[in-house]
From Swiss-Prot:
Keyword Nuclease belongs to the record: no
Known pathway: Phospholipid metabolism; CDP-diacylglycerol biosynthesis; CDP-diacylglycerol from sn-glycerol 3-phosphate: step 3/3
UniProt organism field: Haemophilus influenzae (strain ATCC 51907 / DSM 11121 / KW20 / Rd)
Reaction catalysis annotation: a 1,2-diacyl-sn-glycero-3-phosphate + CTP + H(+) = a CDP-1,2-diacyl-sn-glycerol + diphosphate
Transmembrane intervals: 10-30, 52-72, 89-109, 118-138, 152-172, 192-212, 223-243
Similarity annotation: Belongs to the CDS family.
Protein name, as recorded: Phosphatidate cytidylyltransferase
Membrane topology: Multi-pass membrane protein
Main location: membrane
Subcellular location: Cell inner membrane
Result, substituting T59A: In strain: 33
Keyword field: Cell inner membrane, Cell membrane, Lipid biosynthesis, Lipid metabolism, Membrane, Nucleotidyltransferase, Phospholipid biosynthesis, Phospholipid metabolism, Transferase, Transmembrane, Transmembrane helix
Gene Ontology cellular component terms for the protein in this record: plasma membrane
Transmembrane found in the keyword field: yes
């Protein structure tokens, strides 16, 4: 099992790095679209769409919409421009959705009676999770793209590394000190001590990146605000994890799929990032 997980992780990392460094913005966007479509396929089971044919139809319909959306933006993406007319609205939608998700998680299982048997509402949740995630990733990746193609890459990797490192910090802190359960009805393994460990990890990492980047990450933004945003982004990433756990628990599945050997499905790998990336993008570009 461990060998399988390690091999899968190596392949995943190689694929991500290849897409980040070698793909043009348009093809990078198409790769992201493929990830989103796989996420929708997995999400259809949360919406209690049990028949494979119905799941395939719904996924195909939404997948065509996503690819047409990205295709029509192809020239703008290659010019370093990302959904300029709709980006802020998409990210505001994401921030609002995660505010609602917090209420759903806190009140679970009582909240389930409002959404668990409503496929359309569940698919709306999927849209509010995955589409702003794609837009946020692209906006970060293409920041100052025409002047420096790697500036946005550094910014995007910062968010990814921040979330992944904080997740590791939370894991080890929870193992060592975890006593008080964070959300026992949703994810019994998570503790408040683990969350605090993750936030401390994020704080330390933010200082390190700011110091060694010579303020490239921050730009003309307030450093204190950037650090607060980094820590808040990690806090929101925990909500992304908890929200997917809630949907899986309600639908009676352990993993979103078995697509990635030893790691579960696509949603299992990006659940934290689907909350973190739009949240960070909105406040980084429109608030700070």
């Amino acid at each position: 099992m461990l060998k399988q997980r390690v091999l899968s992780a190596i392949v995943l990392i190689a694929a991500v790095l290849c897409a980040l460094f070698l793909f043009t913005p348009f093809y990078f966007a198409l790769a992201l679209g493929a990830v989103a479509i796989l996420g929708i396929w997995e999400w259809t089971q949360f919406a209690r769409l049990k028949q494979p044919l119905i799941r395939f139809f719904v996924t195909t319909f939404l997948g065509v919409f996503i690819f047409l959306w990205l295709y029509t933006e192809g020239n703008y993406l290659d010019a370093g421009r990302v959904f300029e007319q709709h980006l802020q609205l998409l990210l505001i939608n994401a921030v609002s959705w995660w505010g609602l998700a917090l209420l759903l998680v806190i009140s679970y299982p009582k909240s389930a009676k409002f959404w668990s048997k409503n496929p359309l509402l569940q698919l709306l949740f999927a849209f509010s999770t995955l589409i702003p995630f794609v837009a946020g990733v692209l906006r970060l990746r293409l920041e100052h793209y025409t002047h420096d193609p790697y500036h946005g890459l550094f910014l995007l990797l910062y968010v990814f590394i921040l979330v992944w490192a904080a997740d590791s910090g939370a894991y080890f802190s929870g193992r060592a000190f975890g006593k008080r359960k964070l959300a026992p009805k949703v994810s019994p393994g998570k503790s408040w001590e683990g969350v605090i460990g993750g936030l401390i990890t994020a704080l330390v990492l933010a200082f390190i990146f700011i110091h060694f980047s010579n303020n490239t990450l921050v730009g003309d933004r307030n450093i204190t605000g950037f650090i607060i945003l980094s820590v808040a982004t990690v806090a929101i990433s925990v909500l992304g994890d908890l929200t997917e756990s809630m949907f899986k628990r309600e639908s009676g599945v352990k993993d979103s799929s078995q697509l990635i050997p030893g790691h579960g499905g696509v949603l299992d790998r990006i659940d934290s990032l689907t909350a973190a990336v739009p949240f960070f993008s909105y406040f980084y570009f429109f608030v700070l």
